[in-house]
C-alpha cells in the first residue's frame, strides 16, 4: 500500500479544503494518507488580526517526516505568483534530504490557490514543482482526464500542472465542486502512480 503525504500551508482555509479533497482521492485509490501542514511563521497576534484560520486540525510536519512517504503532494496559497514564505521556509530545510537523495524517485505533486483567476496559479505550481524536481521526485500533474478543466460555464481552477482554486480577493469564494473534483482526481492519480512504483 502506497503511503501518501498531503503537505500544505493555508492562511484562510482554501488550501486546507483542497488538501482534504486530495487526501480523499488518494484514499479512494487505496493509499494510506496523512495530511500535515507546515509551521505558521506569522506571529499569532498578527495572524489573528488578519483573520487567519488558526483552528486547522492537521498536525505540524517536520522535514524528517518526508522520507517516510512514497508520494508527497504539496499545496500552498500564492504570494505574488509564487510559493508562500511559510512553505518556502519549510522546503528550504530539506537540504539534508537532497544531499542523501532521500526523496529520489518518489512521487511529487503540487496544488495551489490564488485570489484571482489570473493571479499566478501556474507560476505557483511551477515554484513548488521546481523544489520537488531538485529533490529528485517524479511529478504527477492534473491531466485533462479531469473534464472540469474544460468547463467554460463558470470560473474554475485547475491546470495540467496541478489542482487549483480561486479564493477571490476577499477570500469569500470557497473551492467549487469542480475544483474539489480536480483535487480528488489528482490525489487518485498520485496514489495510483505511487502504487505502481512502490506496491
Curated annotation (Swiss-Prot):
Signal peptide start-end: none
Enzyme class: oxidoreductase
Catalytic activity annotation: a quinone + NADH + H(+) = a quinol + NAD(+); a quinone + NADPH + H(+) = a quinol + NADP(+)
One function term, GO molecular function aspect: NAD binding
Domain of life: Bacteria
Cofactor list: FMN
Keywords for the protein's UniProt record, in alphabetical order: Flavoprotein, FMN, NAD, NADP, Nucleotide-binding, Oxidoreductase
Co-factor: note: Binds 1 FMN per monomer.
EC number(s) per entry: 1.6.5.2
Record-linked InterPro entries: Flavodoxin/NO_synth, Flavoprotein-like_sf, Flavoprotein_WrbA-like, FMN_Rdtase-like_dom, NQO
Residues covered by the Flavodoxin-like domain: 4-190
Coiled-coil regions, chain positions: none
Gene3D superfamilies the record matches: 3.40.50.360
Positions with a binding annotation for NAD(+): 12
Keyword Zinc-finger: no
Residues that bind substrate: 98
Xref: PANTHER family: FLAVODOXIN-RELATED PROTEIN WRBA-RELATED, FLAVOPROTEIN-LIKE PROTEIN YCP4-RELATED
Protein name, UniProt field: NAD(P)H dehydrogenase (quinone)
Organism of origin: Paraburkholderia phymatum (strain DSM 17167 / CIP 108236 / LMG 21445 / STM815) (Burkholderia phymatum)
Amino acid at each position: 500500500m502506497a503511503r501518501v503525504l498531503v503537505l500544505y500551508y493555508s492562511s484562510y482555509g482554501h488550501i486546507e479544503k483542497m488538501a482534504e479533497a486530495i487526501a480523499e482521492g488518494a484514499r479512494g485509490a487505496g493509499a494510506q494518507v496523512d495530511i500535515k501542514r507546515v509551521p505558521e511563521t506569522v506571529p499569532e497576534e498578527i495572524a489573528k488580526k488578519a483573520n487567519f484560520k488558526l483552528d486547522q486540525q492537521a498536525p505540524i510536519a517536520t522535514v524528517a517526516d518526508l522520507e517516510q512517504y512514497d508520494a508527497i503532494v504539496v499545496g500552498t496559497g500564492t504570494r505574488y505568483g509564487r510559493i508562500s514564505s511559510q512553505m518556502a521556509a519549510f522546503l528550504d530545510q530539506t537540504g539534508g534530504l537532497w544531499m542523501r537523495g532521500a526523496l529520489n524517485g518518489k512521487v511529487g505533486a503540487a496544488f495551489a490557490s490564488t485570489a484571482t483567476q489570473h493571479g499566478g496559479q501556474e507560476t505557483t505550481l511551477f515554484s513548488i514543482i521546481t523544489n520537488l524536481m531538485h529533490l529528485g521526485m517524479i511529478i504527477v500533474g492534473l491531466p485533462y482526464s479531469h473534464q472540469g478543466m474544460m468547463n467554460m460555464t463558470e470560473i474554475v481552477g485547475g491546470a495540467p500542472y496541478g489542482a487549483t482554486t480561486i479564493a477571490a480577493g476577499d477570500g469569500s469564494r470557497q473551492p467549487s465542486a469542480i475544483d474539489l473534483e480536480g483535487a480528488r482526481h489528482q490525489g487518485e492519480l498520485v496514489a495510483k502512480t505511487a502504487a505502481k512504483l512502490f506496491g
